[in-house]
Design a protein with these regions (language model features):
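Short hydrophobic beta/alpha edge segments that flank linear recognition/processing sites
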Residues: 58-71, 96-102
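Short, conserved beta-turn/loop elements at beta-strand boundaries and strand-helix junctions
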Residues: 83-89, 304
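Acidic low-complexity segments
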Residues: 88-152
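Hydrophobic alpha-helical positions that pack around
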Residues: 134, 143-145, 188-292, 300-305, ...
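Active-site gating/interface segments in enzymes
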Residues: 221-223, 227-236, 264-266, 302-353
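Ferredoxin-type iron-sulfur electron-transfer modules in oxidoreductases and energy-metabolism complexes
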Residues: 335-349, 359, 363-430
């Protein structure tokens, strides 16, 4: 839905999607023949592996790749480890991919993995062992990080992009699980302030949920974590810092519902709710095992990928393209978007025409027209020093309104990545 006011020069006219526009039926994607889990550690640097090819795993059982942070996650299927390999991500990120071949279809819904014995008494260590990388990707390690003490937990029911309805669906249909999840958070985190952020048009009816309720505007990108910090919590995040540096940890509402279901049912939740957007722009909701190849989702919806079609994880403003239909659905994948090759918006190398649309739309008031000039010629440090590159929240609005079709959003992401590389090299030299 688009609305534009002549006077609201710094206000986006893009709105978050309303759940009423989605079909009521939620499609259940079958258990695939193989799943893949991405561990946030480079395969080449992973020594003393605790996992071997051929090892058997059960649903809900923690898979231990290595000791330490990021080295374990619960399996979403019962099966056998088929491969352990390197996986390349965006902007130089390196992962370790563990592929599991599913076995015993009759036990896929019943296996326990050992969590039931701990469900009666929630504690942070057990939650980190079993529920880190569960649906919604609960950032439980953040609560255990003594280097950055947390005093506030924000539960966001705001979508990360337009056209998505995943979190709204959880808010509306998993209310009991969310309430139980808030109770679990209080038990495992201590006496922290817990804030639930919901769309302004959905703020009624949450007075008894056990958290402080705040309403965010339905104008995109009001639900961005940095804007919530500034506009609702009154805690502006300094340039180069994160909400965690300011004592605030963000949970998606699905992550909290996952905690609630886990400690209510005594099993580790394994199904992720996603919004699927097909080539015609039609939206659907589905549940899928974390680790399922996106090809299985496409098959369930009858979508055939042609040469030069685009497959995106996330929404149209900030989503990231994936190059392989076997890429797994991740714990924080809220949407899958398919764009037909004939419908993909084009980008150009035309120069800026100084129309000012990007400056008017920017929610953090960055002089985008000057910033992009430096980014185009690789002047990354200068763009940070002179035009606040690191203050950009990467909402994508500037690229959306650009008359010259300059890929501003991509320039900004690349600029931040290259700047971080330059600083890492300088630090190593020192």
């Amino acid at each position: 839905m688009l609305k534009k006011s002549f006077f609201a020069l710094n206000r986006s006219w893009l709105k978050y999607e309303r759940l009423a526009s989605f079909p009521q039926r939620v499609r259940r994607i079958p258990v695939p023949g193989q799943v893949t889990y991405l561990f946030n550690t480079p395969f080449e640097k992973t020594t003393d592996l605790k996992l071997t090819v051929g090892a058997e795993v059960t649903r809900g059982q923690p898979i231990v790749l290595k000791e330490g942070r990021g080295g374990r996650r619960a399996s979403t299927v019962t099966g056998v480890v088929a491969a352990i390999a390197s996986h390349d991500g965006n902007f130089g990120r390196r992962y370790t991919a563990v592929t599991v071949t599913t076995t015993h279809p009759e036990t896929q819904e019943a296996a326990d993995g050992g969590f039931a014995a701990h469900a009666a008494a929630p504690d942070l260590d057990t939650a980190r062992t079993y529920l880190t990388s569960a649906p919604g990707n609960p950032p439980l390690d953040c609560l255990a990080d003594d280097r950055r003490p947390i005093d506030t937990i924000v539960i966001s029911a705001m979508e990360e992009d337009i056209l998505i309805g995943t979190r709204q669906y959880i808010l509306k249909n998993d209310f009991t699980a969310v309430a139980r999840g808030i109770d679990v958070l209080r038990q495992i985190s201590g006496e922290m302030r817990i804030v639930l952020v919901v769309p302004r048009d959905s703020v009624q009816g949450f007075g008894h949920i056990g958290a402080e309720v705040m309403a965010a505007d339905v104008d995109y990108p009001s639900g961005h974590s940095l804007l919530i910090m500034n506009n609702l919590l009154g805690k502006p995040v300094p340039t180069g810092a994160s909400p965690e540096d300011c004592g605030v940890c963000f949970f998606s509402i699905e992550a909290v519902a996952t905690l609630g279901r886990a400690y209510t049912d005594g099993t580790v939740p394994v199904r992720k709710t996603i919004t699927f957007i097909d080539k015609a722009g039609a939206q659907s909701l589905a549940t899928v095992r974390v680790g399922t190849p996106v090809a299985a989702v496409l098959s369930a919806f009858g979508i055939v990928l042609n040469d030069r079609d685009r497959l995106i994880f996330g929404g149209p403003m900030t989503g990231q393209a994936v190059h392989d239909a076997n890429h797994p659905i991740l714990a924080d994948t809220d949407a899958v978007l398919v764009q037909d090759r004939d419908s993909i918006p084009y980008s150009s190398d035309y120069p800026c025409i100084n129309c000012g649309e990007c400056i008017r739309i920017c929610p953090v008031h960055i002089p985008i027209d000057m910033l992009v000039r430096l980014l185009e010629v690789g002047q990354y440090q200068e763009s940070a020093d002179q035009y606040a590159l690191e203050s950009c929240i990467e909402c994508g609005l500037c690229g959306y309104v650009c008359v010259a079709k300059i890929p501003i959003f991509q320039y900004i992401r690349l600029g931040k990545y290259e700047l971080a590389k330059e600083r890492a090299v300088e630090a190593a030299d020192d």
